[in-house]
Every structure is written in structure tokens, then in C-alpha cells.
């Protein structure tokens, strides 16, 4: 009632949100849904079904007539998210080269890394362009570290990124964190 009594649903999109936020929204009596999409998917590709119990860390399931699959899946079950459906773009205007870089057999290669559970719910875990590759070849996504740091009560904001010591391909990649307390 403090919000006017008519607000039934809040939809979040753009980036994974802390599960505590979704739970809080539902605790005050408002259904919390998450969506996933990009400009190239006009704009939604996945959404939490309203009738499903919330899975706060998930961006939902593929919307009607849309197929979402993973490419180059690693041992953790994560891979690049590919999207195909009637709302996926035909291509970038007058830029066939850029179009060919992101389209594969009718699927749009999002650049987002995620996993899909056995029920079809999608979980975004990072961006392929953000990946930090350690000396032993392990892939680390800054977003995962940010989520862990965000659970520390004394940290109000943080940002994690990778930076090479120099342009030499053999140099180490450093993991840097900016933390606001």
C-alpha cells in the first residue's frame, strides 16, 4: 500500500541482480521477475515466467518461439549464450562483416557467458570480453568476484577487472579490485 497499492510486478533486466534484492521485493508482496535480452534480440530473449516460483539468480527462461543454447561449454557447464528466434536481428545495417562476427547458423552470439539448468532457467555468469585467464589457464569472470565481495557487509560497492602488466603476451594478467567501503 505504501507504493500505491497497484504495483504487482517488478521486472529487472540489464545485469544480474543480487538475489537479496529480488527476495526483498517479494517479501514486501510484489512479484519479482527478471528478463534478459540485448538490442540485437529486440529486446527480450528470456523472462522469468510469472507462474513459476522465483529463482532470484536466474534471468528466466527463453520466451515463446526463442531458442537459447550454449556454445563452448566448460567443465562448470558455462558457455557463451546463443539466441535464435523471430525477434533476433537480421544483421547490422550496412555492416556485413560485423554481422558475420556475431551470427552463427541463425543464432546471435551474445558474448555473455552463462549456464542453463535442467529446467531451462538461464544464469548469466559473465562476459566473454571480461574474462581473466590465469597463468594456469583458468577462466575467472570479474562478475563472480564482485558478487562474492558484495556479500561482505562492510563493502558498499566494488568493481573487479583484469589488466596485463604490459603488452607482452607472456606477462601476467593482474586481477584488480576497486572497493568502496
Give names to the regions the model predicted.
Residues 1-54:
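Gly/Ser/Thr-rich phosphate-binding loop
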Residues 12-13, 34, 70-71, 83-84, ...:
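Thr-Gly-centered strand-to-loop micro-motif
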Residues 37-38, 50, 73-75, 165-167:
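Short polar/acidic secondary-structure junctions
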Residues 53, 88-111, 146:
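Conserved ANL (AMP-binding/adenylate-forming) active-site segment centered on the GW(Y/F)…HTG consensus within
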Residues 60-65, 108:
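Short coil-to-beta-strand transition motifs
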Residues 62-63, 74-101, 138-140:
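Conserved ATP/PPi-binding loop(s) of AMP-dependent carboxylate-activating enzymes
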Residues 67-84, 102, 115-119, 167-170:
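Conserved beta-loop-beta connector loops within the AMP-binding
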Residues 85, 90-91, 113-179:
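AMP-binding/adenylate-forming catalytic core of the ANL superfamily
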Amino acid at each position: 500500500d505504501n507504493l500505491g497499492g497497484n504495483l504487482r510486478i517488478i521486472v529487472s533486466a540489464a545485469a544480474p541482480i543480487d538475489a537479496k534484492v529480488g527476495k526483498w521485493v517479494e517479501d514486501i508482496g510484489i512479484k519479482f521477475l527478471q528478463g534478459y535480452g540485448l538490442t540485437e534480440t529486440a529486446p527480450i530473449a528470456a523472462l522469468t515466467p510469472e507462474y513459476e516460483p522465483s529463482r532470484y539468480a536466474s534471468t528466466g527462461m527463453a520466451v515463446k518461439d526463442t531458442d537459447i543454447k550454449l556454445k563452448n561449454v566448460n567443465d562448470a557447464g558455462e558457455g557463451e549464450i546463443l539466441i535464435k528466434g523471430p525477434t533476433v536481428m537480421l544483421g547490422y545495417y550496412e555492416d556485413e562483416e560485423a554481422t558475420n562476427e556475431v551470427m552463427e547458423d541463425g543464432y546471435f552470439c551474445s558474448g555473455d557467458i552463462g549456464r542453463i539448468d535442467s529446467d531451462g532457467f538461464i544464469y548469466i555468469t559473465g562476459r566473454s570480453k571480461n574474462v581473466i585467464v590465469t597463468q594456469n589457464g583458468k577462466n575467472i569472470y570479474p562478475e563472480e568476484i564482485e558478487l562474492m565481495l558484495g556479500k561482505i557487509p562492510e563493502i558498499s560497492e566494488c568493481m573487479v577487472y583484469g589488466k596485463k602488466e604490459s603488452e607482452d603476451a607472456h606477462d601476467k594478467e593482474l586481477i584488480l579490485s576497486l572497493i568502496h567501503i
